[in-house]
Amino acid sequence: MSCLSRLNASAAPWEPPVARAMAVEQYCPPPQSLLPPPPLPPVAVPTTCGCAACLQGCFVPVGVQAAFPHAAAGCAPPPPVMPVMIVYRVVQPPPPAAHATRCQITEIEDGGGVETAKAVDGDEPQPFIRTVRSTRRRKAAAIRLPKAFRAALLPPPPPPCALGFTATTTSLMIRNIPNKFLKARLMAILDQHCADENGKCHRRGGGGGRSVVKSEYDFFYVPIDFKTGFNKGYAFVNMTTATAARRLRAFLQDHRWDAAMSGKVCDVVPAAIQGLDAFVAHFSASCFPCRTKEFLPVWFEPPRDGEQQTKAHVVGRLVVRPR
């Protein structure tokens, strides 16, 4: 049978239905448009939440897993994440320690009295009150100089008035005398001093009728070592006035005995016994075991001034020991 249509000679030939079903369908894309392409359908993928359903191999669509990964599998959602809380605690300062009772301090007032200060519980310490011991320790720690330099930094010695000299001091102790000097030689030095000072006073006075204080002495004693026959390095003299005593001290103080070939430096200080009567009463009951009266104390009448003749009176008892 002919496959050509008798109705229309120009029409396409007719094909049986089986051949049409076996024809390959080709996809023709739609024309280009301005809208974005539609999304792809969800794909089933395994979840990785770690629950029991997930471990058995259940699958959750991708769209559902992105929002609620445990909803499709029937798992309980995890607990919500708790927010981080920062707690600040205010720490109170420790209470102040209880004030302890301080020790008792005794201070010496300027007038000689003693003032005692007792500490009371709760009173505040005074930072400006310092003891004498702590002040000395700080000064000693601050000064780290050699001994020679520390001696040079010491304050100067007090004036003569602070060493015991008063307006009534007449008796003197002459120290650091050469041991070979005997009484006669020392008396010659005193006589020469008195004569020179009296001559100066008369020249200054000029005969104007003013009273002149003379330099003269009425007691003298040089202790002697009876075994060696030398003096013990000191002597006692009593001047008739305090003015004469100050003149003698100014003459002999710090005197060097270079003429006697001695390195001693003379020192003059007030004697423990003051006055002629006190010297005579002190040495009258003394015994001197020697063979000559030249070693005994003497007092003079009238006082010696380096010019006029005087009479010497021996004080004490001479005791002669048998050989």
UniProtKB/Swiss-Prot annotation:
Q: Which residues form a coiled coil?
A: none
Cellular component per GO? ribonucleoprotein complex
Q: Which GO terms describe its molecular function?
A: RNA binding
| Top-level division of the source organism's lineage | Eukaryota
The cross-references to Pfam families, in alphabetical order and at most eight, read: RRM_2
Q: Which InterPro entries match?
A: Mei2-like_Rrm_C (IPR007201), RBD_domain_sf (IPR035979)
What is the protein's name according to its record? Protein MEI2-like 6
What's the source species for this entry? Oryza sativa subsp. japonica (Rice)
